Amino acid sequence: MILYPSIVDLMEKVDSKYTLCSLVAKRARQLIAGDTKLVDIDSDKPVTIATEEVNNGLITYQRPKKYGIK
C-alpha cells in the first residue's frame, strides 16, 4: 500500500486507475531494463521511482484515437 503520493494525487495525472497501473508498470520495466531515473529519491524500487515520476508529471501518456465501425 502506498502512502505517498496518495492515489488521489496520482489520479489527477491520469484518466483511470487502469491507466495509472499500466503507466507505472511500463515505466518500472523500463527502469529495470536500465533506463535512467528522472527523479532524485532514495528508493531503488522501480515501482516507487515510476510512481514518483508520474506524480511529478515527468511521465505522461497519450490515448490513441478510437476507431469506430463505419
Swiss-Prot record:
<dbReference type="GO" id="GO:0003899">
    <property type="term" value="F:DNA-directed RNA polymerase activity"/>
</dbReference>
<comment type="similarity">
    <text>Belongs to the RNA polymerase subunit omega family.</text>
</comment>
<protein>
    <recommendedName>
        <fullName>DNA-directed RNA polymerase subunit omega</fullName>
        <ecNumber>2.7.7.6</ecNumber>
    </recommendedName>
</protein>
<keyword id="KW-0240">DNA-directed RNA polymerase</keyword>
<dbReference type="GO" id="GO:0000428">
    <property type="term" value="C:DNA-directed RNA polymerase complex"/>
</dbReference>
<dbReference type="InterPro" id="IPR036161">
    <property type="entry name" value="RPB6/omega-like_sf"/>
</dbReference>
<comment type="subunit">
    <text>The RNAP catalytic core consists of 2 alpha, 1 beta, 1 beta' and 1 omega subunit. When a sigma factor is associated with the core the holoenzyme is formed, which can initiate transcription.</text>
</comment>
<dbReference type="InterPro" id="IPR006110">
    <property type="entry name" value="Pol_omega/Rpo6/RPB6"/>
</dbReference>
<dbReference type="InterPro" id="IPR003716">
    <property type="entry name" value="DNA-dir_RNA_pol_omega"/>
</dbReference>
<dbReference type="GO" id="GO:0006351">
    <property type="term" value="P:DNA-templated transcription"/>
</dbReference>
<dbReference type="Pfam" id="PF01192">
    <property type="entry name" value="RNA_pol_Rpb6"/>
</dbReference>
<keyword id="KW-0548">Nucleotidyltransferase</keyword>
<dbReference type="GO" id="GO:0003677">
    <property type="term" value="F:DNA binding"/>
</dbReference>
<keyword id="KW-0804">Transcription</keyword>
<comment type="function">
    <text>Promotes RNA polymerase assembly. Latches the N- and C-terminal regions of the beta' subunit thereby facilitating its interaction with the beta and alpha subunits.</text>
</comment>
<keyword id="KW-0808">Transferase</keyword>
